[in-house]
């Protein structure tokens, strides 16, 4: 299954230092056990189209071999460290899980 998470950072957290810390956190969360593969990125500079949304600041893309492994990731301490450490930066978070 695929776990996609989109983050919108609050305006006051757009500075380079905060972004660097957040990116380090994204790197760490991609290393949590049970993840088959993980990566993150920023909106791609593709041509504007009515169907694309580039309003987010970061996207996190995690693959799991099963829903059970996804569920184990959700309660892993490193996941909690990420959420607790960065939740105050977020204006909005959108999760899309695909099977």
What positions do the PLM features span?
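C-terminal structural segments of small proteins and small subunits
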Residues: 64-88
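Charge-dense polyanion-binding interfaces
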Residues: 85-99
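Conserved short hydrophobic interaction patches
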Residues: 25-29, 76, 89
């Amino acid at each position: 299954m695929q776990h996609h998470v989109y983050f919108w950072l609050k305006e006051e957290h757009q500075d380079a230092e905060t972004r660097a810390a957040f990116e380090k956190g994204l790197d760490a969360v991609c290393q949590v056990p049970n993840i088959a593969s993980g990566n993150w990125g920023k909106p791609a500079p593709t041509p504007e189209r009515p169907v694309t949304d580039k309003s987010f600041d970061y996207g996190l893309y995690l693959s799991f071999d099963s829903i059970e492994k996804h569920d184990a990731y959700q309660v892993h301490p490193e996941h909690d460290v990420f959420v607790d450490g960065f939740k105050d930066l977020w204006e909005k978070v959108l999760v899309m899980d695909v099977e």
